[in-house]
Amino acid sequence: MGRGTLALGWAGAALLLLQMLAAAERSPRTPGGKAGVFADLSAQELKAVHSFLWSQKELKLEPSGTLTMAKNSVFLIEMLLPKKQHVLKFLDKGHRRPVREARAVIFFGAQEQPNVTEFAVGPLPTPRYMRDLPPRPGHQVSWASRPISKAEYALLSHKLQEATQPLRQFFRRTTGSSFGDCHEQCLTFTDVAPRGLASGQRRTWFILQRQMPGYFLHPTGLELLVDHGSTNAQDWTVEQVWYNGKFYRSPEELAQKYNDGEVDVVILEDPLAKGKDGESLPEPALFSFYQPRGDFAVTMHGPHVVQPQGPRYSLEGNRVMYGGWSFAFRLRSSSGLQILDVHFGGERIAYEVSVQEAVALYGGHTPAGMQTKYIDVGWGLGSVTHELAPDIDCPETATFLDALHHYDADGPVLYPRALCLFEMPTGVPLRRHFNSNFSGGFNFYAGLKGQVLVLRTTSTVYNYDYIWDFIFYPNGVMEAKMHATGYVHATFYTPEGLRYGTRLHTHLIGNMHTHLVNYRVDLDVAGTTNSFQTLQMELENITNPWSPRHRLVQPTLKQTRYSRERQAAFRFGQPLPKYLLITSPKENPWGHTRSYRLQLHSMADQVLPPGWQEERAVTWARYPLAVTRYRESELSSSSIYNQNDPWDPPVVFEEFLRNNENIEDEDLVAWVTVGFLHIPHSEDIPNTATPGNSVGFLLRPFNFFPEDPALASRDLVVVWPLENGSTYAQRWIPEEDQSCLKPPPFSYNGSYRPV
């Protein structure tokens, strides 16, 4: 539907405003008390929005599963966050609750000019109006930029089966499999993006693979380029074919050359282990599967997390309380986990910390390998939050939470146990000290247990699994972390492919790639009036004051304040100061500005040259850190459309910096990019392991408190030596219930001696 179709006149706009104001006055309470202002839509709300949209006859909606692109259908419904100023007035000043609205994305494929249009629908829970949500000024959402739907995948699968009919004998001989009518020996595919070479195109390379556990690691050597830009699937065509290092104009040409003996054929081995009589063993020993192989001596169960007196955190709706912490959360279907209204010690330190985007940028020798630049919000990053397994994905003691997504469906879909919340020991003390008497004994020992609260979810974007953690420490430190695991994106082995990756199996190249993740960090440090400054070390060379004949070199502190956005946008390749501070004009008792420090843990680097073709969709990836002034028009660094139209995306982060606004004593947002280069290696078979493949950042109080706020923790032990040679241990935790899980009595002897 064209945006002009539902344009409102001044009278209509006035009526809409009155409806919204009236709705705000009588908006019902939502789960989680005031935190409900951030809560994801309930199943009832999602259904109400869907029903309201269907009641608008001018939209001419059809079910999303209808197998045609020439239809109007709802693609996404999710909660639309109210404006920050309205939320803060509601939370802090007792103003009325903001209107609760949904964001609805509709694909209008039945229009003469197919398009994608977004609407705000409200008020919830009983919608009565809808209004346009236009893209940023100067941008549009092209029809070709929409994410691929299940219906489109079904049509593409049919097209691939149809187009490869001339290759049935070729497939049987080279792979032992086929498309369609294949029983247990089938072919499947992986599609890559961007889909084409210029804006408006929808031309996708497909990797054909053998269907079996871990099929991502079983390419057949055949890749096809399909043009599927038309709303009529009958018009879709296979434009090119690549097989084992050579290009062909069509499947028919490859089939003909194969029949003529002109194709360099690779016969793929049977991946299943064989018995003595040539029959497949009952349990396949697939290299791409998780089945144990090899021998470890340990066959006992490992340690478990226990909570003898139950959890020390509480959960009310979408509000979490833990020690000094309080925060709300939501699992946004489009982009993932958001932490909101973060308080510590009763004081807000952040309004929002959220995942914005995750990309994986590849190189390769095959056309699919060299084309792959995954921008994962375009693949439903926030909606692929599948079930978490107790004792593996999260401790058995965790609280598991379900999620609802209305994404490419005709109603809300329940994802059980999509999130988990748990406390765990870190295995490292938060702090400790052994105070030696330097005579074989000690004056005291003191230590504070390392305990953290973790909120976790995952995103399984086809081959890759991202584990998303927000971690809360008892000393006011918060950490955001991403762990990468799952299957590597792999292509067919050719000798030339070794320039772009590692040979992982007989016919397999693991393609090198860079993972980058972007976060939005809206810190409110002692209020919304903040500035940005850095601290660095500089060496000085001075005359030694107590020995003037000598020189002294020592570190000094260099403080830099930044007044403009461009100054605070640090590009990859330029030095990034170690101490990155969001500061308040308020001071702590010792005269220092109350601040929070950003500390990045990352091995990221610039991957694409600035301005190079698809790079326009990920301009945030130019900067490990950029600090901007808060604007309601700059809430996300990416969009669900950037993947499929990276050449003219509707969201270009670089534009956030173009006006170069003042950032002194303003409401500030930090945009953080972390990541790492992944050169696959044989130990990535069957899956990439998490150790060494985790990145993130810390938010650390820096002169924010007068002393360590973890002094309030009771997980402390202080041990004193007594004159009789024994020790006295002071503890502040409650006595544990008698049970088989009771740990042994605490003991400590601080002496040391030669032996």
Curated annotation (Swiss-Prot):
Reaction(s) this enzyme catalyzes, per UniProt: histamine + O2 + H2O = imidazole-4-acetaldehyde + H2O2 + NH4(+); N(tau)-methylhistamine + O2 + H2O = 1-methylimidazole-4-acetaldehyde + H2O2 + NH4(+); putrescine + O2 + H2O = 4-aminobutanal + H2O2 + NH4(+); cadaverine + O2 + H2O = 5-aminopentanal + H2O2 + NH4(+)
Cofactor: binding comment: Binds 1 copper ion per subunit. Binds 2 calcium ions per subunit.
PTM notes: Topaquinone (TPQ) is generated by copper-dependent autoxidation of a specific tyrosyl residue.
Documented activity regulation: Inhibited by amiloride and amiloride analogs.
PROSITE patterns linked to this entry: COPPER_AMINE_OXID_1, COPPER_AMINE_OXID_2
Secretion signal, residue range per the UniProt entry: 1-24
Molecular-function GO terms, alphabetical: calcium ion binding; copper ion binding; diamine oxidase activity; heparin binding; histamine oxidase activity; primary methylamine oxidase activity; protein homodimerization activity; putrescine oxidase activity
GO cellular component, one term: bicellular tight junction
Glycan attachment residues as annotated in the record: 115, 541, 749
Record: residues binding Ca(2+) 1: 522-524, 667-668
Keywords assigned by UniProt, alphabetized: Calcium, Cell membrane, Copper, Disulfide bond, Glycoprotein, Heparin-binding, Membrane, Metal-binding, Oxidoreductase, Secreted, Signal, TPQ
Listed cofactors: Cu(2+); Ca(2+); L-topaquinone
PANTHER family hit by this protein: AMILORIDE-SENSITIVE AMINE OXIDASE [COPPER-CONTAINING], COPPER AMINE OXIDASE
UniProt name for this protein: Diamine oxidase [copper-containing]
Organism ancestry: Eukaryota, Metazoa, Chordata, Craniata, Vertebrata
Gene assigned in the entry: AOC1
